[in-house]
Amino acid sequence: MPLLARLAAALRAPAPPADAPTREEPRRPARPNAPDGAANHVVVVLDSCRFDSFVRAKPRFMSRLGEVQRRWTYATWTAPSHYNLLIGLLPHESPRNVYASDYYKQDFLRFKERLNFDVSFADMVPNLWLPGYLRSVGYRTGMYVSMPVLNPATPINRDFDDYALMDRHNDIVPMIRRMRFYEERPSFYVLNTGETHYPDATPDEPENHWPRISGVNGVFKHLDDHLRAGRAVHAREAEAFFDGERLAQLHARQVNAVQWVDRAFEELLDTVPPNTWVTVTADHGECFGEGGYFGHGPIQHDKVLEVPFVEGRVR
């Protein structure tokens, strides 16, 4: 059974019998009313999407949000990158001649524009956890993920009203349709979508058309499991499996995946209510042979660190 299917089965265990004792959940304080005018915020994370792939795709709908920027991720792998995002550290601009502490402060202040109220990051101490803070000021929170390393049993699933590992790793549409927005309080959502993660397959592509490359110790090993965590592949090991044409094809698949997500993104723009701020970015990039690297993770290379970033208020 593929890795994703095994994890999904384990995480979707049958419900206990009706007479089974229930575990008492810790009491949460009553959720207050949100600040007046507080905005909904939706963060879309295109897993493994390179900045240049995004630019080559020329996304029509995502680009409506604002200027497409090249930014830099704080981490080269999915789990730590999402942790950074959830403490409020979105991909950075790599500014020169600026103290890091000053940049953090300026970057956090951007949340006042995104959320449309006077955000107090002093209130995030000591938890340093954006979903928890937003719940404490009246938000509903949700996160839908494609990657098994972010499954609901992991520590990332904290302070969310709705958190789910989706049935398919490469389809943002069910995430969009699962989101709920309310008149009485704003919502915060994170959507981790995997169309742009290897094998860069869109939902309309038959699985037997996906690329199959076996026998390599690294990111493209275990492709029957499809979505194992990325590992570096040394150029000597990969030489027999990857030539320039093959790598170009793999990169082109990611560009095509961005275009597919962009078409689906039109539905997201139609779904969210007025006063919603949407951010689109990636958790990390991907190497397609540059510098002798393949994949992401334990790789120090610009193409793994460069990510797209675009955001803005909808209507």
Describe these PLM feature segments.
Residues 1-315:
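Catalytic domains that recognize anionic headgroups
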